[in-house]
């Protein structure tokens, strides 16, 4: 049976894992790293993903896309995107349906597409390790992702050629990895501060039963925000000193971002670091400007103190929703790279009143949990039951624009709930159901998930028709809504898609494009490997010809030189088949050179042997079988 893989699709880095026997195993990528940068870049002739995309970001900032998870499932007019638009070197545009898309090399891409390119990279990593095709996956999302964001993540999996068996919340996945072998009953808080999002989840673990009690968070709070605080500080200090605004230079901005991320990481273990960026800009006099600045841990903490405190409020809300106090928490588990920051650890310790658990790798534990869930779905992991919750309330807009909840936040999923509504006007023959998700009292203040009509209602006074509205949330947290006229039996049901979102046709087109690109990528890789093989063969053959050409007849030398010349000509083209043909011709011609070399050596050895005196040969034999040696051996045996 083919393996189901677990993927942590992160804002900054992604990770893939599988079940290896009874334990999850993180798979290293082609570069030997256990996590892969969630970065995609477009050059003139190829698309890059992962470390190769990150390496060229400084020289190609406008076409290098990162942090796309913060865009997924979001509208172009989202207030959170306004500040990001100013700070990002690449362009965020309207996808034509009101969704936020990105632009690179003149083409527009949905966040689901960019995420799909990252998922393809993770898929290839797993396939390379397993030696077989992978078609199914469990993918993680922030617990506080809404329906549109979950659906967009599932779309990304489909575009990448993966059947997404389950969308699982990141803190819940981390809890699975933490509690897999624990038998005693424990109540834990998972504090997950990653590259772009923050979640806190309260769970009860009891001998294989993982029950989520509550979840809270912020899908626009993470390491990217910490980085931008450092970037803005560096840019301001540089502007004060040199009267040059680096934020207007996309290449300089990308260099600052990389320097900020590096400094942030270093300050988790050091009290001070130096940021050194030579030739970062040009002065008004044409002279190059360099950035050399010191950044202390204390200064970093003052820059991001409010961001850290912003993560504590959801912790209090999650405890309240779970009906628990801080003292009821047995263990606090830290997840996400930002939890390595000492100030974050201090604030979490201060709030919960206990030292956090440090027994899990914050960068890998989510992927490991996804692999465990994959094992559960595949039947390889027994006695594990996961009960998750929906993070936000769901309902419909009723008379006066009021948000009427059908399913409250932190309801265990999967779940189904029905409620009877009626018409607002006399003789109303149709109703429009507008579905929202959120916690505000007025529908317009919440996130609209979609809308649909129920038509054919018989004329009747207002309040008489009975319309049953049913909400159904599956284990992925994705919503279906139905409406039924109890009088006529007419009903309408839809799986909610955001008012933007990708249509089935969009997804199919992107799947085809991904498949075509995969074929093109394979062809390009084949060309590069064939070209390398040809160049190596040319070099080796020319060297052999130079050293041993006199040992073969001139016609053989001429044949080899002709074949080499033809192969060099094919190397000027991008025709893989022609290059392979040239390799074959040179190999066959060079074989005669090899045969001649070995024949010449054999003839030389034979001539030397024929010229050796018989007595000398016998003398050598006598020296080998030495009487004294045999006597000594006998003495040892007797001893």
Swiss-Prot record:
Keywords of this entry: ATP-binding, Chaperone, Nucleotide-binding, Phosphoprotein, Stress response
GO MF annotation, one: unfolded protein binding
Induction note: By stress conditions e.g. heat shock.
PTM-bearing positions, type Phosphothreonine: 197
SUPFAM superfamilies: Actin-like ATPase domain (SSF53067), Heat shock protein 70kD (HSP70), C-terminal subdomain (SSF100934), Heat shock protein 70kD (HSP70), peptide-binding domain (SSF100920)
Entry superkingdom: Bacteria
Family the UniProt entry places it in: Belongs to the heat shock protein 70 family.
Protein name: Chaperone protein DnaK
Species in which this protein is naturally found: Jannaschia sp. (strain CCS1)
Taxonomic lineage from the root: Bacteria, Pseudomonadati, Pseudomonadota, Alphaproteobacteria, Rhodobacterales
């Amino acid at each position: 049976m083919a393996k189901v893989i677990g993927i942590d699709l992160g804002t900054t880095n992604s990770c893939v894992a599988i079940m290896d026997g009874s334990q999850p195993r993180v798979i290293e990528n082609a570069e030997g790293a256990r996590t892969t940068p969630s970065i995609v870049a477009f050059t003139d002739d190829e698309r890059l993903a992962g470390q190769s995309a990150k390496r060229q970001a400084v020289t190609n900032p406008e076409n290098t896309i990162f942090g796309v998870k913060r865009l997924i499932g979001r509208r172009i007019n989202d207030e959170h995107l306004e500040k990001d638009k100013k700070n990002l070197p690449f362009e965020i545009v309207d996808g034509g349906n009101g969704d936020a898309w990105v632009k690179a090399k003149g083409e527009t891409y949905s966040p689901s597409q960019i995420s799909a390119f990252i998922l393809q990279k993770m898929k290839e990593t797993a396939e390379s390790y397993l030696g077989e095709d992978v078609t199914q996956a469990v993918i993680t999302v922030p617990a506080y992702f809404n329906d549109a964001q979950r659906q967009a993540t599932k779309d990304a999996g489909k575009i990448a050629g993966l059947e997404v068996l389950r969308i699982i919340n990141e803190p819940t996945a981390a809890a699975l990895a933490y509690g897999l072998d624990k038998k005693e009953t424990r109540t834990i808080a998972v504090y997950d501060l990653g590259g772009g999002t923050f979640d806190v989840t309260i769970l009860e673990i009891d001998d294989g039963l993982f029950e989520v009690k509550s979840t809270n968070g912020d899908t626009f709070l993470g390491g990217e925000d910490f980085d931008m605080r450092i970037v803005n500080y560096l840019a301001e200090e540089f502007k004060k000193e040199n009267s040059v605004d680096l934020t207007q230079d996309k290449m300089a901005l990308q260099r600052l971002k990389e320097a900020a991320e590096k400094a942030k990481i270093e300050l988790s273990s050091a009290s001070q670091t130096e940021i050194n960026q030579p030739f970062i800009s040009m002065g008004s006099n044409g002279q190059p400007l360099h950035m050399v600045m010191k950044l202390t841990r204390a200064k970093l903490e003052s820059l991001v103190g409010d961001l850290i405190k912003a993560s504590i409020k959801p912790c209090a809300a999650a405890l309240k929703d779970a009906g628990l106090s801080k003292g009821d928490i047995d263990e606090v588990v830290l997840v996400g790279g930002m939890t390595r920051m000492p100030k974050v650890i201090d604030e979490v310790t201060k709030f919960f009143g206990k030292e956090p658990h440090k027994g899990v790798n914050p960068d890998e534990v989510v992927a490991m949990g996804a692999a465990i869930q994959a094992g559960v779905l595949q039947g390889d992991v027994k006695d594990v039951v996961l009960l998750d919750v929906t993070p936000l309330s769901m309902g419909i807009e009723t008379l006066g624009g009021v948000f009427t909840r059908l399913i409250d936040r932190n309801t265990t999923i999967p779940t189904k709930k029905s409620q009877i509504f009626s018409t607002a006007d006399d003789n109303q023959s149709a109703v429009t159901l507008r579905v929202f998700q959120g916690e505000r009292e007025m529908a317009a203040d919440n996130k609209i998930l979609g809308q649909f009509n129920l038509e054919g209602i018989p004329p009747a006074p207002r309040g008489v028709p009975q319309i049953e509205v049913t909400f159904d949330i599956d284990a992925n947290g994705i919503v279906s809504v139905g409406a039924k006229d109890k009088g006529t039996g007419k009903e309408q049901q839809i799986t909610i898609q955001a008012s933007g979102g990708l249509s089935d046709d969009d997804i199919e087109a992107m799947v085809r494009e991904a498949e075509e690109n995969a074929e093109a990528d394979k062809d390009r890789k084949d060309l590069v490997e064939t070209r390398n093989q040809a160049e190596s063969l040319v070099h080796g053959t020319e060297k052999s010809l130079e050293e041993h050409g006199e040992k073969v007849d001139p016609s053989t030398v001429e044949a080899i030189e002709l074949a080499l010349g033809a192969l060099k000509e094919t190397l000027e083209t991008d025709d893989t088949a022609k290059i392979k043909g040239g390799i074959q011709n040179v190999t066959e011609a060079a074989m005669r050179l090899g045969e001649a070399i070995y024949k010449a050596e054999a003839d030389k050895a034979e001539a030397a042997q024929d010229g050796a005196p018989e007595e000398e040969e016998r003398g050598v034999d006598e020296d080998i079988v030495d009487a004294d040696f045999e006597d000594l051996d006998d003495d040892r045996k007797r001893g």
